[in-house]
Swiss-Prot record:
The gene is znuA. It is found in: Periplasm. One of its GO terms (molecular function) is metal ion binding. SUPFAM superfamilies: Helical backbone' metal receptor. This is High-affinity zinc uptake system protein ZnuA.
Length: 318
């Protein structure tokens, strides 16, 4: 009986500890709002702290509803990294409970703000451009994402990714100064890797630079400008519902008139929607994944993400 009581007390104590902090085993982590930020953070925090992504694959940063367990993860994190309130408005309130030195809003960094693109901004002087025709007609008014004055898809900019990596390095150095050598080495490796990767992507994309295309999400401006691609514009289409006959006619007319080579959807689009858009034209259809769903977080994941995106462009435009 005595043995049983002792076991019961131990079990109750263990339960109390878990209730006090259900994430006590993984409390010291770098937590990012979305997967691509996790790619950058994982490269810098490699061998220092684990990196976790708050949003599950398939969830939208525009309208995610935090669970109590998510709030706990934010509070127990060593560092929280997000784009900023224009992209992840749902984080603004819970992050008031997190110390300022334990969070980074990347879009607000002094090193990043000069690199921000205005919404719908493209480099019109870019060679090979035939102009950008933006189609804003909607099948679903909630489907187009506006982030205010600036394009907030900043993880698609290698230049901003580099500044993000430096900021993450510097903050982790403040929080864990004992890891200086490892953090310094990680940052040097990331910067070298990024520079080499950019050279490879320039070579890969050169043959398709003058080929026009449309997208279903106005997210890619940073990547397109950086690598000299030729977007013709974007259509706003509900990923779940096939557009009506009149809308399809409008889209197909633009595809043909502007001599588009390809129209790109994203992983959340149903195949029937994608097929319906390009049907009856010679325009190919492809898929771009701006969040890198399925790419494992490790020290190579950001460059793997950029390479995957480049391959997705080339596979449809070549």
């Amino acid at each position: 009986m005595l043995h049983k009581n002792k076991w019961l007390k131990q079990a109750m104590l263990a339960s109390a500890l878990l209730l006090a902090n259900p994430f006590n085993l993984a409390s010291a982590a770098v937590v990012t709002s979305i997967r691509p930020l996790g790619f950058i953070a994982a490269a810098i925090a490699d061998g220092v702290l684990p990196t976790e992504v708050l949003l599950p694959d398939g969830a939208s940063p525009h309208d995610y509803a935090l669970r109590p367990s998510d709030v706990q993860r934010l509070r127990s994190a060593e560092l929280v990294i997000w784009v900023g309130p224009e992209m992840e408005a749902f984080l603004s309130k819970p992050l008031t409970q997190v110390a300022e030195n334990k969070q980074i809003a990347l879009s607000q960094l002094p090193s990043v703000t000069p690199l921000l693109m205005k919404s719908d901004e493209h480099d019109e002087a870019e060679e090979g451009e035939s102009g950008h025709h933006h189609d804003h007609a909607k099948d679903n008014p909630t489907d187009d994402h506006h982030h205010g004055e600036y394009n907030m898809h900043i993880w698609l900019s290698p230049a901003i990714a580099k500044q993000a990596a430096i900021a993450i390095h510097d903050r982790l150095l403040e929080l864990t100064p004992q890891n200086k050598d490892k953090l310094d080495a990680n940052l040097r490796r990331f910067e070298y890797q990024l520079a080499q990767n950019e050279k490879n992507i320039v070579t890969m994309l050169k043959p398709v630079q003058g080929k026009g295309y449309f997208v279903f999400h106005d997210a890619y401006g940073y990547f397109e400008n950086h690598f000299g691609l030729s977007p013709l514009g974007h259509f706003t289409v509900n990923p779940e519902i096939q557009p009506g006959a009149q809308r399809l006619h409008q889209i197909r007319t633009q595809l043909v008139e502007h001599k588009a080579v390809c129209v790109f959807a994203e992983p959340q689009f149903r195949p029937a929607v994608i097929n319906a858009v390009a049907k009856g034209t010679n325009v190919r259809s492809g898929t771009l994944d701006p969040l890198g769903s399925g790419i494992v977080l490790d020290k190579d994941s950001y460059v793997n993400f950029l390479s995957q995106l480049s391959n997705q462009y080339v596979s449809c435009l070549k």
